[in-house]
UniProtKB/Swiss-Prot annotation:
The lineage of its organism: Bacteria, Bacillati, Bacillota, Bacilli, Bacillales. It comes from Bacillus subtilis (strain 168). Its EC number is 6.1.1.11. Consists of two distinct domains, a catalytic core and a N-terminal extension that is involved in tRNA binding. PANTHER family: SERINE--TRNA LIGASE, SERYL-TRNA SYNTHETASE. GO terms for cellular component: cytoplasm. This is Serine--tRNA ligase. ATP binds at R262, S263, E264, E349, I350, S351, S352.
Length: 425
């Protein structure tokens, strides 16, 4: 959510920046008129309340003097009715304003490249050598089928499309990966490990920006106003909703492993096979609460920490700076880390690292004090995948595949897999 005072003072300038995000600004254009009406109503109500207090004092004087006060009492009642009517209109206007404010996307940071689609994203850096094959590299679902470690067919029978059973060494590889990721972030980067709830309430989904705009993309629990989490970012960020933190406690860094649930609305026909686009998948999420002046330095740290996972796994990747049109609703700046997928001859997203500035903190009312009696300020929040586990499994199977159908296990994972070096058919 954007700051109302900032919107009021810089309306046209902010609108020009939001145009680059390609968002529908129909509601945004209503803000000025509604905000003016709100301020006008507040002024009228305050004026009438002052008049009512004045009249009330006159009634008291007349009654003490045992004089007729009926005409003034009538006037006071009329003023009261007018206040009631204006208060009702004020509540309606404020509700409309709240709806508009919740629908306005975050403002892109000045360093974000201007563009309309993913084709306008800018490559920041590359790391690693792409593997070369003397044969046509197989897709990970075929490799997994030969190894007997993933079962999409039975998962479709049990649940539906875009689900999977991990079996045997597949399950162990998945577990090895998220344990390795958590150990790295907790031990090397001093994150606090958290296991969050997998269901959250409406206020939590609103706080991080999934609601109201993206409700159709969420899995909702029937008969309850609960949602399955699309990412651990939602419960972890909302841990500190409606709190005032001590400035000395910042930055706060959390690393959380969780299942994530996505409806993938709008993705029909895309990535219908394999692990790239599932309704349920595991992810290690990194969430930061920081002082505003530190947030862009922390974004670089966060991105480097997510990259470190791929470096230790020796998987080639690139880092992309998202353009304004591909930035999403909540981020002020975002990097996507994309891992090399040989069978597709392209890089695919495996992590997004975002700085939301105060956008989420304002929605979730998360503040801090620099000093014990200082004025509360909104924190800046950041989050990034460290990493999406299923996509990492896919990348390992494809980049480490051998012509005989076996897959070499990355060296860093071997202690987590009983010191095995290879998975064989």
């Amino acid at each position: 959510m954007l700051d109302t005072k900032m919107l009021r003072a810089n309306f046209q300038e902010i609108k020009a920046k939001l145009v680059h995000k390609g968002e529908d600004l129909t509601d945004f254009d209503k803000f000025e008129a509604l905000d003016d009406r709100r301020r006008e109503l507040i002024g009228k109500v305050e004026e009438l309340k002052g008049k009512r207090n004045e009249v009330s004092q006159q009634v008291a004087v007349l009654k003490r003097e045992k004089k007729d006060a009926d005409h003034i009492i009538k006037e006071m009642r009329e003023v009261g009715e007018e206040i009631k009517k204006l208060d009702e209109e004020l509540r309606t206007v404020e509700a409309e304003l709240d709806t508009i404010l919740l629908s306005i996307p975050n403002i892109p940071h000045e360093s974000v490249p201007v563009g309309e689609t993913e084709d306008d994203n800018v490559e920041v850096r590359k790391w690693g050598e792409k593997p070369s094959f003397a044969y046509e590299p197989k897709p990970h679902w075929d490799i997994a089928d030969e190894l007997g470690i993933l079962d999409f067919e039975r998962a479709a029978k049990v649940t539906g499309s875009r689900f999977v059973f991990y079996k045997g060494l597949g399950a162990r590889l998945e577990r090895a990966l998220y344990n390795f990721m958590l150990d790295l972030h907790v031990d090397e980067y001093n994150y606090t490990e958290v296991i969050p709830p997998y269901m959250v309430n409406r206020a939590s989904m609103t706080g991080t920006g999934q609601l109201p705009k993206f409700e159709e993309d969420a899995f909702k629990i029937r008969e309850e106003d609960y949602f399955l989490i699309p990412t651990a970012e939602v419960p972890i960020t909302n841990m500190h909703r409606d709190e005032i933190l001590s400035g000395d406690s910042l930055p706060i860094n959390y690393a959380a492993f969780s299942a994530c649930f996505r409806s993938e609305a709008g993705s029909a026909g895309r990535d219908t096979r394999g692990l790239i686009r599932q309704h349920q998948f595991n992810k290690v999420e990194l969430v930061k609460f920081v002082k505003p002046e530190d947030s862009y330095e922390e974004l670089e740290k966060l991105t480097n920490q997510a990259e470190r996972v791929l470096q230790l796994l020796e998987l080639p990747y690139r880092v992309m700076s998202m353009c304004t049109g591909d930035l999403g609703f909540t981020a002020a700046k975002k990097y996507d880390i994309e891992v090399w997928i040989p069978s597709q001859d392209t890089y695919r997203e495996i992590s997004s690292c975002s700085n939301f500035e105060a956008f989420q903190a304002r929605r979730a009312n998360i503040r801090f004090r620099r000093e014990a009696k200082g004025k509360p300020e909104h924190v800046h929040t950041l989050n990034g995948s460290g990493l999406a586990v299923g996509r990492t499994v896919a990348a390992i199977l494809e980049n480490y595949q051998q012509e005989d159908g076996s897959v070499v296990i990355p060296k860093v994972l071997r202690p987590y897999m009983g010191n095995r070096e290879v998975m064989k058919p």
